[in-house]
Amino acid sequence: MADFDMVLKCWGPVEADHATHGSLVLTRLFTEHPETLKLFPKFAGIAHGDLAGDAGVSAHGATVLKKLGDLLKARGGHAALLKPLSSSHATKHKIPIINFTLIAEVIGKVMEEKAGLDAAGQTALRNVMAIIITDMEADYKELGFTE
């Protein structure tokens, strides 16, 4: 619970502008981990240099951060919120679980730079994301997706 609260203390700037922060997160994810771009077929034709200014990238990044905000605000009681996300990411999008660890690290970096998430907050975010990702992984296994 304390970890969730620590992350939420710095969530305000992210929540105030999901689109900008979401664009930063996805653009950095695609830059630091280029292989992840293949998981987003709708962005395939976008030149790398154009990703940051693309409305679709920004909109998807906003969706990611809004969902994460909902999960954070649930403070661990996120099973009902997480199940449909796990299901769509396992069965429809086929996203390997490791990618959630990659994006979590990128979110931490963006929050450090743009929302003042300090070292303790970074640790709290890693702890929170470990809980969420472990729960997603259990959902994935239940669905038979073990990639």
Curated annotation (Swiss-Prot):
Nitrite binds at residue 60. The keyword Transport applies. Disulfide bonds: none annotated. InterPro entries: Globin (IPR000971), Globin-like_sf (IPR009050), Myoglobin (IPR002335). Its main location: cytoplasm. One of its GO terms (molecular function) is heme binding. Its EC number is 1.7.-.-, 1.11.1.-. Pfam families: Globin. PROSITE patterns: GLOBIN. It is an enzyme of class 1 (oxidoreductase). It comes from the Eukaryota. It catalyses: Fe(III)-heme b-[protein] + nitric oxide + H2O = Fe(II)-heme b-[protein] + nitrite + 2 H(+); H2O2 + AH2 = A + 2 H2O. Keywords: Cytoplasm, Heme, Iron, Metal-binding, Muscle protein, Oxidoreductase, Oxygen transport, Transport. Monomeric. This is Myoglobin. It comes from Pagetodes antarcticus (Long-fingered icefish). The lineage of its organism: Eukaryota, Metazoa, Chordata, Craniata, Vertebrata.
